Amino acid sequence: MSRVLVPCHVKGSVALQVGDVRTSQGRPGVLVIDVTFPSVAPFELQEITFKNYYTAFLSIRVRQYTSAHTPAKWVTCLRDYCLMPDPHSEEGAQEYVSLFKHQMLCDMARISELRLILRQPSPLWLSFTVEELQIYQQGPKSPSVTFPKWLSHPVPCEQPALLREGLPDPSRVSSEVQQMWALTEMIRASHTSARIGRFDVDGCYDLNLLSYT
């Protein structure tokens, strides 16, 4: 299935503080990144790709357009998706990730805004985010191909049987061929291999056929 890159604007991340902000132990454990689509009408999201950078868990909320008279509402479509099996180790910390619409918890149609919620509970990493974020929608469908009627509607199995009625019986043809072969062998066996001389007639020479030099 084809896909088309959707132009978007990724806003700066907003950190939500974990712990006492008045002490050195307070640190951002949650980041919120909003993505808008100022030049695109509400669309059906097909795929999200990005490169992880030490984010342990990802949640996604989408804002879906309903109508001009109803305000768009936020819906959670992905909740605590694991990007690092162990937040305290390097595994998965810098992997490329692709998320498809069939993995989402809700319908991904009429999307007007996207919100990424990043979590990293481990104190080992100084910073975390996602990079190279790209949003895709479904591309135009391929034009339908028209097949000939004889190809799209196969001939029923009964019709070839009717066509065979006009053909000779294979066993009869085989028998006649064998008879012709036997007759040919008989003629070949009875044919003399003696050479006939140019002027030899019944073992004698015909004087009228001889030429004088």
UniProtKB/Swiss-Prot annotation:
Broad class of where this protein is predominantly found? nucleus
Keyword annotations for this protein, in alphabetical order, are: Microtubule, Nucleus
Looking at the UniProt record for this protein, which Gene Ontology cellular component terms does it annotate, in alphabetical order?
Answer: microtubule; nucleoplasm
Its tissue distribution reads:
High expression level is found in brain, testis, liver and kidney. Weak expression in spleen, leukocytes, small intestine and colon.
Which InterPro entries does UniProt cross-reference here? Nicolin-1
Compartment list: Nucleus
Q: Which cysteines are joined by disulfide bonds?
A: none
The UniProt transmembrane annotation reads none
Subunit: Part of the neuronal tubulin polyglutamylase complex which contains TPGS1, TPGS2, TTLL1, LRRC49 and NICN1.
Protein name per UniProt: Nicolin-1
Q: Species name for this entry?
A: Homo sapiens
